[in-house]
Amino acid sequence: IKYKYTLLANSYLKVNKINHNIETKELDLINLNGTNANCDFILKNISIGNDTIDVIINHNIRETTSNIKCDGLSVNKGTLNLNVTTIIPNGCVRAKANQDNEIISMNELNNTIKPLLLIEEYDVEASHSAKIGSFNEDDLFYLKSRGIEEKEAKRLLINSFLKRNLDDCEIKKYIDELEVKYEQRRF
């Protein structure tokens, strides 16, 4: 699957995306082609197969902004390979680029995050982060100490992880529907 977004001057794009297919191979290509083009891209990926997601953000002109937030949940036999690349060529002054990537693994399989900042300009603000792990044992212990069984505690943590950074009620509703669908499965 390939998605291409092109933003011109003074435009704004907000993408809230949820994937939960068995095998996902996806490319999201974002071209910021006009001054003051701004993009907020939020991806939630539930991996139950071998998933590969590539996100490429091209800051093709000065004074552009991208905020990329990719969250993955690896369950059952699922793996996630997440590649996020931001490109800021020379001359694209005052560009702002942020990447925040996290995968929560509910299995023992390998997941990868490759955050790349390819920057040829000095006058920019850019940051990236990548985290792969499981839920914090202290959080799980706290919920269990309050009488919540482990399965329910994990369900609450998964729900919170998938809904964070989302402000669209329809997407939150969709996650609730997914939760019902997967309720019979063991995470």
Residues covered by each model-derived region:
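Conserved beta-strand/loop scaffold segments within soluble protein domains that form the structured core
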Residues: 1-148, 161-164, 170-187
